[in-house]
């Protein structure tokens, strides 16, 4: 009498091989999602810094902070904003540039995010 061939033994370990093949794709997608979230966070922080810098630059307080100090104080400690101020008529505009941090290995730079905020200067009649 003849035995039927055993085909089940050849599939042993197939799931592990498929998992190992899919793991790099899963890691790349996860890192891309994390990097996208960090880029959005950097943009949000740049906007916060621009508004804080414009608010400080439009203040008529004599001992008030300058725009760069206010922008730096308004963001997380691991973000280093660069602020530039321009006066135009009865308003002040502050532009803040923030570098996007990278979490992806072997990729050095994802560029910068730039946000601008404009605030009115106080009227001289109010003094």
Where are these regions (language model features)?
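Alpha-helical assembly-interface signal, strongest on the long, hydrophobic N-terminal helix that forms
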Residues: 1-66
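Short, conserved structural patches
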Residues: 2-4, 64-127
């Amino acid at each position: 009498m003849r035995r039927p061939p055993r085909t089940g033994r050849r599939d042993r370990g197939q799931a592990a091989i498929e998992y190992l093949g899919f793991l790099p794709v899963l890691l790349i997608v996860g890192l891309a999602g994390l990097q996208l979230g960090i880029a959005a966070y950097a943009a949000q922080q740049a906007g916060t810094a621009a508004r804080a810098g414009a608010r400080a630059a439009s203040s008529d307080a004599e001992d008030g902070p300058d725009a760069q100090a206010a922008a730096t104080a308004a963001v997380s400690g691991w973000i280093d904003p660069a602020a530039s101020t321009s006066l135009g008529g009865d308003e002040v505009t502050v532009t803040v540039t923030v570098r996007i941090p990278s979490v992806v290995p072997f990729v050095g730079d994802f560029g910068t995010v730039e946000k601008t905020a404009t605030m009115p200067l106080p009227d001289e009649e109010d003094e």
